[in-house]
């Protein structure tokens, strides 16, 4: 039974990888004498720098790749915003001077954690980047905001929400670049942001509000339209609770596989991946009466289970059948949002922790609120309340990228088409809104490009049906530093061990799609980026 969704499995619940070791200080690069940075609107409380030897785990996580040990200067800058009474920690890791590549990389968070720290900072430092992460002054708990969302009087803590939503990412850029310059005695040649999920949202917010912070921003699977996205994660739970039907993950997996089988060929090649989502129509009721093997036993799909699967696939709707948010993409897993559990023989909902924290703390303003009481009729009201109260501060979906265009900064985004948590339609919707606002696709391509990855899960972590992008940051660096605007992004599908490549693909620049030309379907060379998939029946 999966109790914590995939999103949390990629996040360290505590930064515990590191062990300190004393090292000789080289040349004039004194880790203990970092100059306090100047942060507008904030007071620096402390700057503590120590030489450390840290163990870096590979990212994405891989059981076959060993950890690596590197020496760094580790600097913690603690600051407080004027009149807020918060305490924000920005952690900066600096490779020793002979290992520095001359670049700075800020790293993003995931879930309710503003920073993932070691998880992303370690690999960045290993590549030679000076790198930073921030806790935004909130608890480093990716699963919940319950401990900080509300003030003692029961009202929303808008100061900390603003930290989490945008302010602390900007602060991290200022602090990280200043500490980098203080240590190496010269500024970074180029600065980058790297994040996925909430980290992707952070990157999009930087592009919208503070584009001068970075030369390049990589935003994977961005959790933009944050109020709508988080509210929508409760929909599968409302469906199961309302219908009093709680299909097992094995039954849900049968529906997922049937959806892939129904739509796989629409892109011209049968490869276990749905690339043509727009042309895909899947009828869950076709499975009624079919037997599926679940462990040692077989079970028969019921009409009630198919009805639940259909309602979840169709996405949140009002009682008048008005769409409130996006549908679950065919091929995406139900695991994560449609979990249930059994207590004393009785099936119960098991809500997605990140979304349930949103509803409890920010919408209901009651950390003890019982989510099982939410009905179909409640959903439109929750969506509207979410937008009304929080879109301005946390939406991350402003299509006006005038400042980004003017800054010269490049924004590179990608999204898995089988993202089970943050559905890819949000990224497509946002890109279309930007095109409408900023003068069309070819104009926007000068500074913002989107790549879609068929069959790829949330942030590409774990086993994917499709090919997940690799070397995404290198693609961005080439665009920023050499002017090589990407038409494609390399991607690979691997086995569960992560060591064997099953097939390769080139992800296409939106709105182009991968059209099969013929030949070995496991080779990226057998596909071309085209305006459509061609005619297939």
From Swiss-Prot:
Family assignment from sequence similarity: Belongs to the tannase family.
Locations listed in the record: Secreted
Organism (species): Arthroderma benhamiae (strain ATCC MYA-4681 / CBS 112371)
Protein name as catalogued: Probable feruloyl esterase ARB_07085
Binding-site list for Ca(2+): 264, 267, 269, 271, 273
List of catalytic residues: 197, 419, 458
Taxonomic lineage: Eukaryota, Fungi, Dikarya, Ascomycota, Pezizomycotina
Gene Ontology BP annotations: xylan catabolic process
PANTHER family in the record: CARBOXYLIC ESTER HYDROLASE, FERULOYL ESTERASE B-RELATED
Listed GO CC annotations: extracellular region
